[in-house]
Swiss-Prot record:
A biological process term (GO) from this entry: D-amino acid catabolic process
Protein name: D-aminoacyl-tRNA deacylase
Chain ranges for the short sequence motif Gly-cisPro motif, important for rejection of L-amino acids as given in the UniProt record: 138-139
InterPro entries named among the record's database cross-references: Daa-tRNA_deacyls_DTD, DTD-like_sf
Domain of life: Bacteria
Signal peptide range: none
Comment on protein domains: A Gly-cisPro motif from one monomer fits into the active site of the other monomer to allow specific chiral rejection of L-amino acids.
Function: An aminoacyl-tRNA editing enzyme that deacylates mischarged D-aminoacyl-tRNAs. Also deacylates mischarged glycyl-tRNA(Ala), protecting cells against glycine mischarging by AlaRS. Acts via tRNA-based rather than protein-based catalysis; rejects L-amino acids rather than detecting D-amino acids in the active site. By recycling D-aminoacyl-tRNA to D-amino acids and free tRNA molecules, this enzyme counteracts the toxicity associated with the formation of D-aminoacyl-tRNA entities in vivo and helps enforce protein L-homochirality.
Family the entry assigns: Belongs to the DTD family.
Length: 150
């Protein structure tokens, strides 16, 4: 499972020109799922995301988590995160899970993160053509791949 975490002052998802979800200060999380992902990946990521210290404290040091600041989360599924550019110029998405595998994992991810944050998590719509708008604060952008731990 791969996630891109972006610290934002605001973010939103629109579908066919209509606003679907919006958050204020918090994190926008793009999620890519592959067949070998499971509940252990979800637990690792949602624990890490909810406690990741990427928000400034009163001294201007990144020492606070989204939970500490009572921030919001917007989660968007993005199969293109699983793209491979190893061969040729067109990305291959063969590693991305099919919807019947990915949707339950995506929903579990959102539920787990919501429980850890103690509040509802806003979401995109799985498989929809979405327009994602954000104001990246910093910018701060973190990539985590559960199968390539660093």
């Amino acid at each position: 499972m791969r996630v891109v975490i972006q610290r934002v002052t605001e973010a939103s998802v629109s579908i066919r020109g209509a606003l679907h979800s919006r958050i204020g200060q918090g994190v926008l999380i793009l999620v890519g799922i592959e067949d070998r992902d499971g509940e252990s990946d979800i637990e690792l990521l949602t624990s890490k995301i909810s406690n990741l210290r990427i928000f400034d404290d009163s001294e201007g040091v990144m020492n606070l988590s989204v939970k500490d600041i009572n921030g919001e989360a917007l989660v968007v599924s993005q199969f293109t995160l699983m793209g491979s550019t190893r061969k040729g110029n067109r990305p291959s998405y063969i590693k991305a899970s099919r919807p019947e595998i990915a949707i339950p994992l995506y929903e579990s991810f959102c539920n787990s993160l919501s429980a850890k944050l103690g509040k509802a998590v806003r979401q995109g719509v799985f498989g929809a053509d979405m327009q994602v708008a954000l104001v990246n604060d910093g910018p701060v952008t973190i990539l985590i791949d559960t199968h390539n731990k660093e």
